[in-house]
Regions:
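S-adenosyl-L-methionine-dependent methyltransferase catalytic core, i.e., the SAM/SAH-binding region
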Residues: 1-362
Length: 362
């Protein structure tokens, strides 16, 4: 876990740091006996703090994150007297710097069996507001900073490498398939022209400029008139949104991570244990839905979408997973994903695209 000196008490969580779908997550574990609880994507500990407050019976907690700073903040928040308000935190608190794909290994590190040990597991596939709000990490098109986007700062591939070294065709495919960007061809061309003219693209601000999105305002900020002069709200989506999403997914191999993390998390569940997964875009939600269906014995593998064919997801899967139906290992508790109530969306716009799916181990 993250080592280091004492941490300043974290500021009270504002809307940006508010855990999404918190009520729905608590509902997923309500009335369950959680002896062992694991949060695969700990972030600042918002979800876990609330779960632990409602479940004083938790004996062993395992919180996993790649980001050492997030771990340090979460450790402070979840300690006795910390911001989460836990009077008596679980006896065994484990903070692990690691990858959520390796949950069984992290459980073994906490002295538990790697499989069949966890009564509750939570996975939030969104990226932490700590990363988005730090311009140095290069995740946000709203704050100028180095073009980076690596969840794991130690890896070689960054957004800067992708934007400057990938060919126009490859960039276009990434924007189309991972960003679901309609104007992929035009935007890939702009990136390549801009870097040829400037020598390279080094910052998030330069990338926004390359995309022709510098100084963009939604229509409602332009005296409330839409493109035809009519009074209607304009598109709320910044034109760089999908490009930044695509690069983030590509740089971090996010779809492949989710693809291998879900079966590992299901393995880690004890009988009757529950796994809740929050996703933020349709590609991820689709992967979660089909992984759960396969584990519930309801479906053969999903037909490969363009995105999955392109990203190499499931390309390596052979044998029973693509052949027949797996024997049922879980029961799906969410026929449709749970989404944020209008009040939450108003308070925290990030929650608008969040979806929660839950399964229970048989």
């Amino acid at each position: 876990g993250g080592q280091g000196g004492p941490v300043a008490a974290p500021a009270p969580p504002d809307a940006r740091h508010a855990p999404v779908l918190l009520r729905e997550c608590l509902g997923a574990f309500a009335g369950r006996e959680l002896g062992v609880f694991a949060d695969c994507t700990l972030g600042l500990g918002g979800h876990s703090g609330a779960v632990l407050a409602e479940h004083p019976e938790v004996r062993t907690f395992v919180g996993v994150d790649k980001d050492p700073r997030a771990l340090e903040i979460a450790r402070g928040r979840l300690s006795a007297g910390g911001a989460a308000g836990l009077r008596a935190p679980p006896a065994a608190m484990n903070f692990v710097r690691g990858d959520f794909r390796e949950l069984p290994e992290h459980l073994r590190g906490a002295g538990l069996p790697g499989e069949g040990a966890a009564d509750g597991i939570l996975m939030d596939l969104g990226f932490s507001s700590l990363q988005v709000d730090d311009p140095e990490r290069g995740f946000s098109f709203l704050r100028d900073g180095p073009l980076d986007m690596r969840m794991d700062p130690a890896q070689a591939l960054s957004a800067r490498v992708a934007v400057n070294e990938w060919g126009e065709e490859e960039l276009g495919r990434v924007l189309r398939d991972l960003g679901e960007e309609r104007h992929w061809r035009r935007l890939a061309g702009r990136i390549v022209q801009f870097r040829a003219a400037r020598g390279s693209i080094e910052t998030t601000g330069e990338l926004v400029e390359a995309l022709g999105a510098k100084g963009w305002k939604p229509y409602h900020a332009r005296r409330g008139r839409g493109p035809g002069g009519g009074r209607r709200a304009g598109p709320a989506l910044h034109p760089a949104t999908r490009t930044f999403q695509a690069l983030r997914i590509a740089v971090n191999g996010e779809l492949q991570s989710v693809e291998s993390a879900l079966p590992a998390a299901i393995d880690a569940l004890a009988p009757g244990g529950r796994l809740g997964v929050i996703s933020f875009h349709s590609l991820e939600d689709r992967l979660v839905k089909w992984a759960f269906r396969r584990a519930a014995g309801q479906a053969r593998a999903a037909p490969l979408s363009k995105q999955e064919k392109f990203s190499g997801v499931r390309a390596s899967v052979t044998g029973p997973e693509l052949g027949g139906t797996d024997a049922a290992r879980v029961r799906i508790l969410t026929k449709r994903p749970l989404t944020a109530a209008p009040e939450e969306v108003e308070e925290n716009p990030r929650s608008r695209s969040a979806k929660l799916r839950v399964v229970e181990k048989l």
